[in-house]
Amino acid sequence: MREIVHIQAGQCGNQIGAKFWEVISEEHGIDSSGAYIGTSDLQLDRAEVYYNEGSGGRYVPRAVLVDLEPGVLDTIKAGPHGGLYRPDNFVAGQSGAGNNWAKGHYTEGAELVDSVLDVVRREAEGCDCLQGFQVTHSLGGGTGSGMGTLLVSKIREEFPDRMMCTYSVMPSPKVSDTVVEPYNCTLSVHQLVENADAVFCIDNEALYNICYNTLKKPEPAYPDLNKLVSGVMSGITSSLRFPGQLNSDLRKLAVNLVPFPRLHFFMIGYAPLSADGVTAYRAKTVADLTKQMFDPKNMMADCDPRNGRYLTASAYFRGKVSTKEVEEQMDAIQTKNSGQFIDWIPNAIKASVCDVAPTGETMSAAFIGNSTAIQDIFKRVGSHFSAMFKRKAFLHWYTGEGMDEMEFTEAESNMNDLVSELQQYEAATVEGEEEEDEYAEGGVVNGDQSYDEPYQAA
């Protein structure tokens, strides 16, 4: 089977990861000790994508739990689902990264990384046909960002032909946990641009807004936010774990969503989202789900897709859904909102359908969009970064761990390049391409004009 090895790093990554395992264990009918208590054969049909069947029929998650301090991992071990995981798969340091990317990437994290890779290797060897890895982490702290990206690059080195997807929690515009978030995030993005195949951008503020405005929770807490994220994670992988009419896997996902290798930062959404008690009053049709799925208020990253254009998008429907209806809706949304889609990629929306709905729903949909509006996040982080870096504020914490200022400059320019690439593709049009060809034929263009990038129409 096409297995996925899951790695969670740092406090945020472990909390999101733990919630994800709760959600999919429930879907597969696996209780907190790993025993199967489900009711349908479909639940076990492809459970081995995420679970290893141990002795005595126990299902053990293919999960590696990593942190540089033992606190969060101890909480997970002692929690109601602690018995689910393989005890050897917990790898904890003692010192913590103290929100310092350099500690996670170069000093403390580097000491621990070999023992983590041993566990990852063992999990990978236990797979028949490993499809790839998924990592949950945040980019604002020390362990998730520093050590998380170190793991991503080491795994990429060792398994160059396997997919690498990350669920990365971006720093929020208004809710900031630490002052050095812009540094940690920029250094991480610099790594993810090079070493990941797909990065799903999540941010706490957007999640707060969804909980507060859509789910009508007056005081959203982290478990509420993590539940939202795990809903999308479960939706994206549903067609790998259950039979469906239009299947998908991590590689298909990347092939359909990434038009240029560096542009693999996606925004994600989920439908249906409705407040408790209102669910019964809402009609659920494919049209409703599509409408909610493409609603900017539904995006789990704080950037408005209306400010940019979609290069590509993917929709994952679950439940008793007609494939024909799904394709009609996808076609309709592109025709109706043609201004929001790039005109030089026709049929930009890929759909997949899985027959098994999530627990407690009749149908649901997860959404992934590759939109040029994601540059808002990078611009915001970049401006905070340059404000601090200009004055060399807080730099001594990083240089003290052996980092060089050059690395900061490189990371900053890599992120700025990413923003300008996104802007360039947003402005490019089909006419621009044709114009370029005419110029080329007429031999008017200077020798140094490059044709790699789309020519921008005047």
From Swiss-Prot:
Keyword annotations from UniProtKB, A to Z: Cytoplasm, Cytoskeleton, GTP-binding, Magnesium, Metal-binding, Microtubule, Nucleotide-binding
One family name in Pfam for this protein: Tubulin
InterPro entries the record matches: Beta-tubulin_BS, Beta_tubulin, Tub_FtsZ_C, Tubulin, Tubulin/FtsZ-like_C, Tubulin/FtsZ_2-layer-sand-dom, Tubulin/FtsZ_GTPase_sf, Tubulin_C
Compartments it resides in: Cytoplasm, Cytoskeleton
Keyword Cytoplasm annotated: yes
Domain of life: Eukaryota
Record-listed Mg(2+) binding positions: E69
GO cellular component: cytoplasm; microtubule
UniProt-recorded Gene Ontology molecular function terms: GTP binding; GTPase activity; metal ion binding; structural constituent of cytoskeleton
Needed co-factor(s): Mg(2+)
Biased composition (Acidic residues): 431-440
Residues annotated for GTP binding in this entry: Q11, E69, S138, G142, T143, G144, N204, N226
Signal peptide segment: none
SUPFAM superfamilies named in the record: Tubulin C-terminal domain-like, Tubulin nucleotide-binding domain-like
Segments for region (Disordered): 426-458
GO annotation terms (biological process): microtubule-based process
Family of this protein: Belongs to the tubulin family.
Self-association and partners: Dimer of alpha and beta chains. A typical microtubule is a hollow water-filled tube with an outer diameter of 25 nm and an inner diameter of 15 nM. Alpha-beta heterodimers associate head-to-tail to form protofilaments running lengthwise along the microtubule wall with the beta-tubulin subunit facing the microtubule plus end conferring a structural polarity. Microtubules usually have 13 protofilaments but different protofilament numbers can be found in some organisms and specialized cells.
Function of the molecule: Tubulin is the major constituent of microtubules, a cylinder consisting of laterally associated linear protofilaments composed of alpha- and beta-tubulin heterodimers. Microtubules grow by the addition of GTP-tubulin dimers to the microtubule end, where a stabilizing cap forms. Below the cap, tubulin dimers are in GDP-bound state, owing to GTPase activity of alpha-tubulin.
Protein name as catalogued: Tubulin beta chain
The encoding gene: TUBB1
